[in-house]
């Protein structure tokens, strides 16, 4: 069964057509990675799917009927108002808004009450569920810490916890690892993969790193200039020819037994220019006696 069926999604912002008739289907329990160069429309498509930007076309969730067009508030017709969408779709924006002075627990609790209104309406069950998610993500020790004092990786786990506590079947993430180093990127994505399996979640995420997309996405979709130009399994989408066409780089793609794709991007040589010598490959010839002294400690 399809978790999302989007048909003819069109978005115009400030007179510019950002998305142009995008058709996209995401199966239940699938991880779809949205790819494309900067300005391709990835974030706008995520906003259209999650109902936070006005759009033309239709979006259907889990077989629920949807009408043409979009409401004035940006939400897809047939998906209900903001509270109903909060039950269906949990969103992790690229730059989450973090209220000053809020604790990690209070922030996660907002994920339970988004469809209810004010944070003060949280029930005892909401609080228990919020604490349980913090425990699952190994964040319990940070529950009463000011969210702004946590490291980037810890903060991103809390942001993910807020989305998970909503118990929505669809999780939409816009560049969830953009501000993290490589180690923390894989930590967050491995955790997300575990949670997807545990909960049977449908995951839609935008990514810039082709190698990461090839390792984690069940299916990939590529946008270019507001149009969907490819959609399929990683091995079908991530080929040297396709990467050269859409990103303008040379790449080698290796497919493993599970259909995951490892992407290696190669530096392009400029005709007539010799590459600079690699210092690491040149034997050292300077002795300690020849070294230039440095003032200081």
Q: Where are the language model's segments positioned?
A:
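ABC ATPase nucleotide-binding domains
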Residues: 246-297
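The feature captures the beta-strand-to-loop junction immediately N-terminal to the Walker
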Residues: 35-37
